[in-house]
Structure formats: C-alpha cells, structure tokens
Amino acid sequence: MALYKAQKAAIIEQFRQHENDTGSTEVQVALLTERINILTEHLREHKHDYHSRRGLMKLVGQRRRLLRYLKRTDAQRYQALIQRLGLRG
C-alpha cells in the first residue's frame, strides 16, 4: 500500500521542473495521484476498510487543493499536468 522509494524517485524524475526539484506542485500532485490509485485498488478488494477510505478522502482533498492553486497561478502548467496524469475525464 505504501509508495516505495524507487517508485517515488521515478515519479519525481518524470514530473520535476529542475534537477533538485522534489516539492513543486506538479511533483506533489503526481505523488498524491499515485498514492490515490494504490489506495483505490486496495479499497476495491477491502470494501469495509473505512480507515483507509478516510485516508483516501484526505489525499483526494489535498490533491484538489494543490490543483486549485496551480490552476489559479499558472493555467498552462495546470492543463499540461491534467493531460499527463489523465485526470478530469
């Protein structure tokens, strides 16, 4: 259920803006999206795991806030990120 170090490094490598970038909005959203996908798969199998469901809702809320911030500050980066992650329909 956790995101392994190698997976995390690969996601950071793919979405970073510059060489030392680990905390840009794009990287944070990509990491949250991966964690959300993992938890979603877990909940498909364990339908009554309500504690994990609450954690999933918190992650989705955090991702929503970050995406709202990115849309407000730089709409082009927002659109590019949505396309790359396959979010929003």
Swiss-Prot record:
GO MF assignments: rRNA binding; structural constituent of ribosome
Function according to Swiss-Prot or TrEMBL: One of the primary rRNA binding proteins, it binds directly to 16S rRNA where it helps nucleate assembly of the platform of the 30S subunit by binding and bridging several RNA helices of the 16S rRNA. Forms an intersubunit bridge (bridge B4) with the 23S rRNA of the 50S subunit in the ribosome.
One BP term from GO: translation
Source organism superkingdom: Bacteria
Any one annotated GO CC term: cytosolic small ribosomal subunit
Organism from which the protein derives: Thermomicrobium roseum (strain ATCC 27502 / DSM 5159 / P-2)
Protein name, UniProt field: Small ribosomal subunit protein uS15
Keywords assigned: Ribonucleoprotein, Ribosomal protein, RNA-binding, rRNA-binding
One Pfam family named in its UniProt record: Ribosomal_S15
SMART domains, alphabetized: Ribosomal_S15
Complex and partners: Part of the 30S ribosomal subunit. Forms a bridge to the 50S subunit in the 70S ribosome, contacting the 23S rRNA.
CDD domains tied to this protein: Ribosomal_S15p_S13e
UniProt xrefs under InterPro entries: Ribosomal_uS15 (IPR000589), Ribosomal_uS15_bac-type (IPR005290), uS15_NS1_RNA-bd_sf (IPR009068)
Family, similarity comment: Belongs to the universal ribosomal protein uS15 family.
Gene3D superfamilies per the UniProt record, alphabetical: 6.10.250.3130, S15/NS1, RNA-binding (1.10.287.10)
